[in-house]
């Protein structure tokens, strides 16, 4: 196929632009900062879309079906949707760059939210469940966006870059639920069921996140990182050395994934059953909300400090800290009197903090252990495992409490978190 002069000129300009970053550390640094800014802005919208929808998903299903029996299905559906979407967003990002993968993921999540609104209007449970599955794409993209800021970061900046995007997610995640009543009133004013109101916010927020990334994430950080890495490759004997590096990279991926999967299982399991445990001991919804609020705050707000610690003290030290913190959380939750608000707040705050340590150190390990040729695809695969482990943790937690007790669940979770230590120690061996 022949290209016209304008097409050839455009390709030449793009190539020259990419090449300019190879020889200019200042331009690389500037793009790194710009990428962090753009991703952080998108995460504010993404967090709002995630939290607003999650808040009322179960209530919409309950209202449509007239029973509590399937109220947990919305959470399961968008978790499954998130798992599948994580794989797709990772593949798209690997092939076309972060800009395409992330913007597409958020926009698809927005379409899912619109589908939920339509389902509420026409009272279609089938459309609701399909739409919730699609809505899960926003959840997956919100999580994967944390990787975009690391593409141009050096080894000592990667955890800090992840932590910055997580803090900005908090702003949206806090704003979303606080606007539930406002959006419910707005929905009624335009003839939409009030419970669909938060999904109006979710649709707008996810679409805005996608637009911000599509317009502003230029040049694409993963494409630039790939160009720089290719330019810096030196020809030579890659036989034994390459095989050794591949083994080490594979080990790092296994450890990073294990850290995040285990922390996700433990966190989701204990968090899911804590409100039920509290209600059984006479706490009202306000008290439950307070404990969960402290928990969510501890999951995200310490991120900036955690990122600095992971970069300075090392991934291994903070992964071990994650395991010990989760153990402490499990022990306190297990033996705290059911009537003690203070001890439950402490336990759930430590649970959130341990998860924070694990996610940031595990993410940094994944980034350290991959190159630009496979990074986005590998990250997407790991996020599938995280999503599925969260779903498994939530499902198993109810079974354990039903078959035994909240005490047993908390102790099992705490002990399970200790598996992080031998896994991390193994990773240090040759």
Curated annotation (Swiss-Prot):
It is found in: Cell membrane. Keywords: Cell membrane, Membrane, Transmembrane, Transmembrane helix, Transport. The keyword Lipoprotein does not apply. GO terms for molecular function: transmembrane transporter activity. InterPro entries: MFS, MFS_dom, MFS_trans_sf. The chain crosses the membrane at residues 36-56, 69-89, 100-122, 126-148, 160-180, 197-217, 253-273, 285-305, 317-337, 340-360, 384-404, 406-426. Pfam families: MFS_1 (PF07690). Belongs to the major facilitator superfamily. It comes from Bacillus subtilis (strain 168). This is Uncharacterized MFS-type transporter YdeG. Gene3D superfamilies: MFS general substrate transporter like domains. It is a multi-pass membrane protein. One of its GO terms (cellular component) is plasma membrane. The keyword Transmembrane helix applies.
């Amino acid at each position: 196929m022949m290209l016209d002069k304008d097409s050839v000129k455009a390709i030449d300009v793009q190539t020259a632009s990419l090449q300019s970053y190879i020889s200019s550390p200042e331009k690389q640094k500037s793009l790194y900062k710009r990428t962090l800014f753009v991703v952080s802005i998108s995460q504010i919208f993404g967090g709002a879309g995630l939290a607003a929808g999650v808040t009322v998903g179960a209530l919409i299903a309950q209202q449509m079906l007239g029973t509590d029996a399937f109220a947990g299905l919305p959470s399961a559906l968008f978790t499954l949707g998130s798992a599948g979407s994580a794989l797709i967003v990772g593949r798209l990002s690997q092939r076309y760059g972060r800009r395409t993968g992330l913007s597409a993921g958020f926009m698809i999540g927005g379409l899912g939210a619109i589908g939920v609104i339509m389902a509420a209007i026409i009272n279609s449970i089938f459309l609701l469940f399909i739409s919730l599955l699609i809505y899960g794409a926003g959840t997956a993209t919100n999580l994967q966006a944390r990787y975009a800021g690391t593409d141009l970061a050096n080894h000592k900046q990667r955890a800090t870059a992840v932590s910055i995007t997580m803090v900005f997610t908090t702003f949206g995640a806090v704003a979303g639920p606080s606007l539930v009543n406002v959006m419910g009133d707005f929905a009624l004013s335009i003839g939409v069921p009030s419970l669909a109101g938060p999904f109006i916010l979710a649709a707008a927020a996810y679409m805005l996140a996608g637009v911000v990334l599509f317009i502003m994430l230029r040049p694409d950080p993963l494409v630039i990182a790939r160009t720089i890495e290719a330019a810096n490759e030196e020809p030579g004997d890659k036989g034994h050395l390459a095989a050794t590096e591949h083994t080490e990279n594979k080990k790092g991926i296994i450890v990073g994934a294990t850290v995040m999967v285990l922390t996700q299982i433990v966190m989701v399991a204990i968090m899911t059953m804590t409100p039920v445990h509290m209600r059984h001991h006479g706490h009202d919804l306000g008290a439950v909300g307070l404990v969960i609020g402290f928990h969510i705050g501890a999951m995200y707000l310490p991120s900036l400090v955690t990122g600095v610690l992971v970069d300075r003290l090392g991934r291994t030290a903070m992964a071990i800290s994650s395991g010990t913190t989760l153990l402490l959380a499990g022990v306190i939750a297990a033996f705290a009197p059911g009537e003690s608000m203070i001890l439950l707040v402490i336990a759930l705050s430590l649970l959130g903090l341990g998860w924070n340590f694990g996610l940031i150190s595990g993410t940094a390990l994944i980034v350290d252990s991959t190159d630009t040729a496979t990074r986005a695809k590998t990250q997407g695969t790991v996020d599938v495992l995280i999503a599925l482990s969260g779903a498994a943790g939530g499902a198993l937690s109810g079974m354990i409490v039903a078959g035994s007790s909240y005490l047993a669940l908390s102790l099992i979770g705490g002990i399970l978190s200790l598996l992080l230590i031998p896994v991390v120690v193994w990773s240090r061996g040759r």
